[in-house]
Amino acid sequence: MEQNGSTVVRAYAKINLSLDVVKKRDDGYHEINSLFQNISLYDRLSIVKIDRGLEIKSNVEIENNILYKVWDLFCEKYKEPEFGFRVILEKNIPMEAGLGGGSADAAALLFFLGKTFKIPTSELLNLAIKIGSDVPFFLIGGTAVVKGKGEKIEPLPALKGYYVDLLTSENGISTKEAYSLLNPSLFNRAPCSPYVLYEAYKNRNAGEIKRCTYNIFEKVVANNYKEIMANIKRLRRTHITAALTGSGSAVFGVSFRDGKYKFVSRGVEYEETKL
C-alpha cells in the first residue's frame, strides 16, 4: 500500500512447529533443532528517504530498537550512505512472545537496504546473524529447518492449507530468561526430527502432527507460568495440535479449516514500492 511515497515492507511473524535444544556451546549460545514457519501476522515498516541517518517512529517504545543495530552494522560494513531513512514501524506482533517480531523487523530493514543498494542475499545473511539468531531465517522465510544458533537454514517447499490461532499472555518471557532456566538434562528430547514433522504436515497426517509437535520450553513454563500451560491445553481441545512458540509466551494452535492466521511462504516482502 502506498503511504505518502514510502516503501512499505511487511515483516511476518514465525511459529516453531517444533523446537528442541541440542546443546549449550562454549560461547554461551545454545544450538537448536527446529521447524520454523512464517504466519500471516505481520509488522509494517513504512520507509522514506531523509537527508541523513536513521530515524524511527513507532506505536510502541523504540528505545534500543533492533533497527538501530541493523543500521549501525550496515553502515560499519558498507559505509554510511549519502542519504538516510525514516522508518515508521507499525507493531502488530506481540513482543517477548516467541513470535520473532524484533528479528522480523530487523530482517525487513535489512531486506530493504539490500534491495536499495543491490547487496546479494549471501552477504546480508552474514550480517543478519550478527544482529540476532533468528534474523537469517526471516530473510529466507516460509518453511525451514533451522539448526545451530540460527545460522543453518534449510528451506523446504511451502506448506499450504493450514490455519493458526494464537493466545498470548499478559506477561512476556525474555529469551535470555527462558534459556537460563533450561536444564541440560532436557536437551535432545524431541519425539521426532523436524523432517518427520514436516512430512506429517505435507501429508496432512493429523495424528503424526500431534505426536511430533514439541517445544522444550514447555518444560520450563510448566512450573513457572501456569497461564501459558492453560492456554496450550485450551487450544489443544479445538485444534489439530498446539504448543508454545519459541521461548514463549505466545502459544499457537493449528487447524486444517479455519483460523485467524495462515501459513505464508515469505519472511519479509514489499507491500508496495515507491521511492
From Swiss-Prot:
Binding, ATP: P94, M95, E96, A97, G98, L99, G100, G101, G102, S103, A104
Recorded superkingdom: Bacteria
Keywords: ATP-binding, Isoprene biosynthesis, Kinase, Nucleotide-binding, Transferase
Keyword Transferase set for record: yes
Gene3D superfamilies: 3.30.230.10, GHMP kinase, C-terminal domain
InterPro entries: GHMP_kinase_C_sf, GHMP_kinase_N_dom, IspE, Ribosomal_Su5_D2-typ_SF, Ribsml_uS5_D2-typ_fold_subgr
Pathway info: Isoprenoid biosynthesis; isopentenyl diphosphate biosynthesis via DXP pathway; isopentenyl diphosphate from 1-deoxy-D-xylulose 5-phosphate: step 3/6
A single BP term in Gene Ontology: terpenoid biosynthetic process
EC number(s) from the headed UniProt entry: 2.7.1.148
GO molecular function, one term: ATP binding
Active-site residues from the entry: K14, D134
Catalytic reactions on record: 4-CDP-2-C-methyl-D-erythritol + ATP = 4-CDP-2-C-methyl-D-erythritol 2-phosphate + ADP + H(+)
Family: Belongs to the GHMP kinase family. IspE subfamily.
Record function comment: Catalyzes the phosphorylation of the position 2 hydroxy group of 4-diphosphocytidyl-2C-methyl-D-erythritol.
PANTHER family, A to Z: 4-DIPHOSPHOCYTIDYL-2-C-METHYL-D-ERYTHRITOL KINASE, CHLOROPLASTIC
The protein's name: 4-diphosphocytidyl-2-C-methyl-D-erythritol kinase
